[in-house]
Amino acid sequence: MTNAPGAGGPTALSAGSAASAEPWRAPVAAGALEAVVELPGSKSLSARALLLAALADAPTTLTGLLRSRDTELMLAALSVLGARFEDLGGSGTHLRVTPAPLPLHVQTGPDGLGRIDVGLAGTVMRFVPALAALADTPVVFDGDEAARRRPMAPLLDALAALGADVTHLGEPGFLPFRVGPGDGALLRAEGTRVAVDGSASSQFVSALLLLGALLPGGLELTPTGPVPSLTHVGMTVATLRERGIAVDEPALRAGDGERTWRVHPGRPRGGEVAIEPDLSNAGPFLAAALVAGGRVSVPHW
């Protein structure tokens, strides 16, 4: 039986098609390698470094920043909240960050509101709304069409429980929405506890941990369900500690609903920060040295 063209059966490959193309030839090292390879910074670490620098107690110089759409969206969002950024090298990977004052002073439009486009950047859509609870003016958040399908309810519910003013501007629990400071009680609280359903994203937990350091009495945070990607929560805790913020972590064997993080109050420390490259980008270059011999160095890692 012969299949007609377009009927889903096999068709003959024409000359010059993939079947007859020359195979790609991998490069071969002429000898042992000796190289220094500058790689872009980790996307996750770049987002956290920018946010903590924007909230620090003094200016911060960032080296090795990843330049991507997510980074550009984070820079724009933090600028709306009052932080300032100066490109020191012309490439956008070396920045001086002047932190925003508290309460965060929102750069508003003609309607008197701040507006932040989160695009499709998870760290912008989850981390930055938590900061808007400490702003002096409400901020409207929206993003790409696909972003409007990503869940936000656990974070928004937690912020409302902390006293923030949360207004849904579309389907409840999704973008777009508005977050404001409410009556400002968060900046007066001497001790704050909150629970969050972290089962949809560990970013909800990280967002509240980052917020907690700015509260006068810190924050005690208990996720109510299983938290995926606990390694990313660990990354958030590590970056907070590197900037001088004390964080108490739950016991290793604590079960779901029993894990509690305690963030002690304080503004992150400014200064010089080098952002570690992403391991997935570094891997091929390091493997090349193992195969060919010699040495390949990756700075800041």
Please place each PLM-identified region on the residue numbering.
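Structural preference for solvent-exposed beta-strand-turn elements
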Residues: 1-301
